[in-house]
């Protein structure tokens, strides 16, 4: 056995690897892992998934674990359905509200003071917690990784699968550690930090990976700043951050 192999075998697991292992239910010959999903967020563009669910005569497996929050086409002012700019966006929200009520999901409706951008509401309301596996039909679901969870975006068919089973088949990404040393200078924001990282590794540098951020500069970030860094992991091509 080579020294390299010994190091690989004895290396402590990263946070991503621990969460993946803790949520693993089964694996298949294609190299995919069946993961249990702790939190599922859906928005008004999730109608395709609900159509698939109902078309297959399936029910939501764990309604309490899914949170429906209209946020993609909601108006910046006004809390009534009539405030929407056109009939199409009104129909999308009505559809989400109807599906949420029909399936007894957690709904943050238009007049709910907790409602906002999904990836802000989850951390702000304590729905997103460390160690969780989290999905949403939105690429920037990685934002929730800032709180120490594994969070990634999924497509409509996967959203339907999560609704029906509270599980998801996924190939295991590789892990990439990015160590940001030192302290930020005055005026350097979290967005500058992540843009600097993307500038170093490239817009596809994180492809096939979950990026795990470390180092003094990261430790000194506020939660809000960490949300920004993890949000933009997608711009580095990563699966999550």
What kind of region is each of these model predictions?
Residues 1-241:
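Fe-S-dependent hydro-lyases/dehydratases of central metabolism
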